[in-house]
Amino acid sequence: MWLKPEEVLLKNALKLWVTQKSSCYFVLQRRRGHGEGGGRLTGRLVGALDAVLDSSARVAPFRILLQVPGSQVYSPIACGATLEEINRHWDWLEQNLLHTLSVFDNKDDIASFVKGKVKALIAEETSSRLAEQEEEPEKFREALVKFEARFNFPEAEKLVTYYSCCCWKGRVPRQGWLYLSINHLCFYSFFLGKELKLVIPWVDIQKLERTSNVFLTDTIRITTQNKERDFSTFLNLDEVFKIMEQLADVTLRRLLDNEVFDLDPDLQEPSQITKRDLEARAQNEFFRAFFRLPREEKLHAVADCSLWTPFSRCHTAGRIFSSDSYICFASREDGCCNVVLPLREVVSIEKMEDTSLLPNPIIVSIRSKMAFQFIELKDRENLVEGLLLRLKQVHANHPVHYETSPSDDDMASPVFYSASICTDKFGDLEMVASQSSEEREEKRPLPHPEPLTAVFQQSGSQSPDSRLSREQIKISLWNDHFVEYGRTVCMFRTEKIRKLVAMGIPESLRGRLWLLFSDAVTDLASHPGYYGNLVEQSLGRCCLVTEEIERDLHRSLPEHPAFQNETGIAALRRVLTAYAHRNPKIGYCQSMNILTSVLLLYAKEEEAFWLLVAVCERMLPDYFNHRVIGAQVDQSVFEELIKEQLPELAEHMSDLSALASISLSWFLTLFLSIMPLESAVHVVDCFFYDGIKAIFQLGLAVLEANAEELCSSKDDGQALMVLSRFLDHIKNEDSPGPPIGSHHAFFSDDQEPYPVTDIADLIRDSYEKFGNQSVEQIEHLRCKHRIRVLQGHEDTTKQNVLRVVIPEVSILPEDLEELYDLFKRAHMMSCYWEHHRPMALRHDPSRPYAEQYRIDARQFAHLFQLVSPWTCGVHTEILAERLFRLLDDNMDQLIEFKAFTSCLDIMYNGEMNEKIKLLYRLHIPPALTENDRDSQSPLKNPLLSTSRPLVLGKPNGDTIDYQKQLKQMIKDLAKEKDKMEKELPKMSQREFIQFCKTLYSMFHEDPEENDLYQAIATVTTLLLQIGEVGQRGSSSGSCSQECEEPQASAPPEQDSVFAEAGKSPQAFPETEGDWTVSLEHILASLLTEQSLVNFFEKPLNIKSKLENAKLNQYSLKVLEMSHPPQAELKLNDL
């Protein structure tokens, strides 16, 4: 590569370089000792010096210097790892610069001109290799060269970043370099003559955590299946850990959770991922999680600022976030003040005059006649320019539609204010108000546009006056809050509103506030008519999803009158079916029916649909799919929170997995299925405001309230009874309606009544005792535990596959486990470096366990070469192709692990007849095709002669009569012919020749090679004769007379085949015709030679093959990717 020119003085330098060639202005040199075979003392000394100093000359032993005539100062301008690479740079210099330099008279001009050209080449090279995105591109390019030389990965394996650190080996630290690439974590150390290489694929990592040990307070520990590795002494450990966490998360989800995981657009192409992309992804994920925004939102700018908060009459310090469709603000003090401004609600963005009291201010005006003042913005010009551009795009793509909701009083104020045609301050943006909601309903009528609680008044709903008065007080408090803090989605969100939510949202405002807190109101306003179209497209269709929906409709709140008739059930059916049509990746999952039925009680049908979208796609990501990965991740996070927040309970209950399992339904249904409905909706209020944090802290509060009984419980069943009874007796004293029990009410035989817990008290305790968890902490825990959950699914898949395969093969379970790891790694390596192949065709978590990982023909060939005992030299790859075609029953060009192990089991543990049968099948269709690349070459071997006798003499004077032996063996085999599942077709002469070539290849380098060759020559001669006899017997009738004489002279017990075989055959016929030979003939012939029998029946050890395969699997793949093999790469046994 080209180097940034730096002057060096060579007059008194040690002779560390040897000049290879030179010109007037350039010198090409080689590092002394490189390519000399290590025999010379000076070369060995230079090599040792480079190793100790970690010199770049170890990986780039060639260089080109710029020399100006008459000067002792030289400038390195290029280096190379190979002679070919450095020669390409030399040729470029001769062709493009050498003739031009002769024009210059001034030496300084020559140096300046060459240096300028080289710097331009470096800029072009870094642009193409993404190094310009690094903070120090020169150092990154040097590290990239070392990474490629040391680990010899294919070109597709891109380096993301690198760090200097120590890797602990027991109590001994090894100083070296940590390289983080898109698929691997690599470590290299060379100290005192000892070289250490570690290669850990990200998909093998089971834990990634920060720990402390006796020697150091902070280390990064990486846990794989077999080992733990500790890395320490980083300059910035926080940065390193975040990058590692992001790389592990992205790679694991891309390769193991591709069912529902969608990468950010910048990360779609793994080979283009950079350190900055990963840092941006981490910031994006925090931003979307904190404000609970759509996944497609991309953060563009973050800046420190202060926001004028009229309720406190001062400016509040915080940060402003600008994304595709939102302007958001978060105060520096957690929970003090947050604001979410959808750009579709923004009318104008203006810069105000800069003053000492209001430095760098901007004003953001929204349609509800509110304005937000931001000050102290450092890069105000660029921020406002970007905001105006995105505002114009949002208004152009989504013209704003206004809805006027008639309000009877101040308590039912509209979410959006009515407006007429409005022109904003850009002049060229017109916001056209659509027809009102009543007009749209006439155009596309919805059966029941009101919440179901308004349509179905429950019997006995006449509540006591005290409950009604408390409801009125709540409504009054909320209206006062709206006046001071705003009533739209753009309201100021402070600790005061959190307290109001914890007290319980009034039923008349519940649906509307759910829409505001989740920002589903923006989706609703941005997609007029979308839900109606979905309903029209989805209703009447019949599929597996609709059948599941129909089955669960009558299980959704059956005790509520709204779902005891067709009206409520029909609305539920429409919402669930429409969502399944919108998002086929999720479709329909159990528990969605319970959640949707509650949404329909308090929101209109279309509003309930968009609330469901917000919950499934933003607030509970990855929850609703057939593996419920998201819920399991939060379940695992909850288990860790129990250890942190309730240490006494964790100490008494050593196994917290039971409590975590019980809590799974809490997360999936938001307590709706295990708590009385009037109490559970209070939980949903907190969930829509605070997100999953509310469920975590409420779950901890429930466990703390029952900690004493849980500690004294004897088993999991008793713990479940304790929690079920407690949750069933949670009441909502402020609910205006009658109590509705949970789906799983607990019936107690106790004589004493169980104490009742008020939901408001429980929620207040949860906020006071466990409300200190921030969104950033929860997202970090989710990322940490997602690795464990995904690896847990991989372990489950592996165990299930092995459980199916073990009974059907004779390979030992521990060997089968290692074989599975090799099989999976073959699939993974293809995903790493062959992005053009559709990964989804090979890895599908929804398929049966045994079929989740499948490999194609090329991957199979690599594995076959590594683990098969039938090594045939250059013929091995051809044999692997034929075996793959044989195993690919459904012809989808993929095979699963079970088929792979079945053929290996025959090779290693099968009897001789099973092995010969497999070889036979490999040389007839479908395994052998007409276009087989080795089937057209004729077999030319002097051993294949048909003139050999059928009776051979032995050294002691005895003879071997093959005719009698073959006759008896064929009779014995014929008896078992009926037992065979399917009679195999006979083999043609062309196929038989290929069969013989395979046998000759298999015997190569065997200790008994000569005996085997002699034996197979004899057997081949015999089989060729048998085939020719059969050919003549099936030819024209003129041969019949010639065949009668030998039959008459032959003994009575001999049949015509052997009698005819005794005659001297002619040479090969010009055409093969009907020349055939059967499996029985081949097997019987082979059995006559003891050396062949010994070869096929000798015990074979698969363990040594597996050990060798683990060490060389990467090297073979790299070689196949046509990368120059400079040093053998071995995957460490982790």
From Swiss-Prot:
Residues 145-212, 285-353 form the GRAM domain. The record marks 551 as: Arginine finger. Residues 437-447 have a biased composition (Basic and acidic residues). Keywords: GTPase activation, Repeat. Residues 504-691 form the Rab-GAP TBC domain. Pfam families: GRAM, RabGAP-TBC. Residues 433-466, 1034-1070 are annotated as: Disordered. GO terms for molecular function: GTPase activator activity. Residues 455-466 have a biased composition (Polar residues). The record marks 590 as: Glutamine finger. It comes from the Eukaryota. InterPro entries: EF-hand-dom_pair, GRAM, PH-like_dom_sf, Rab-GAP-TBC_dom, Rab-GAP_TBC_sf, TBC1D8_PH-GRAM1, TBC1D8_PH-GRAM2. May act as a GTPase-activating protein for Rab family protein(s). The arginine and glutamine fingers are critical for the GTPase-activating mechanism, they pull out Rab's 'switch 2' glutamine and insert in Rab's active site. This is TBC1 domain family member 8. It comes from Mus musculus.
